[in-house]
Amino acid sequence: MPRSLKKGPFIDLHLLTKVEKAVESGNKKPIKTWSRRSMIIPTMIGLTIAVHNGRQHVPVFVTEEMIGHKLGEFAPTRTYRGHVADKKAKK
């Protein structure tokens, strides 16, 4: 269920301060974060945010189409390796 419009988007305060500092200084280094629940806001456009997926930080370059989505949507946590084939069926 989407968040109420009167509440506004959620973004962790520590991530917001890092984003504002990066925009202010023009720094293009990836911003490391564990906050997968934070929403992408327009000030993040053009920045690379390294989102933690439980094992490592996945670099996510923010574009205009990503606004309104959560950071965790772009850093998958599970790897799908396909179903194991039955050995009897091969013979």
Curated annotation (Swiss-Prot):
GO terms for biological process: ribosomal small subunit assembly; translation. PROSITE patterns: RIBOSOMAL_S19 (PS00323). SUPFAM superfamilies: Ribosomal protein S19 (SSF54570). One of its GO terms (molecular function) is structural constituent of ribosome. One of its GO terms (cellular component) is cytoplasm. The keyword Cell cycle does not apply. The keyword Hydrolase does not apply. Belongs to the universal ribosomal protein uS19 family. Keywords: Ribonucleoprotein, Ribosomal protein, RNA-binding, rRNA-binding. Protein S19 forms a complex with S13 that binds strongly to the 16S ribosomal RNA. This is Small ribosomal subunit protein uS19. Pfam families: Ribosomal_S19.
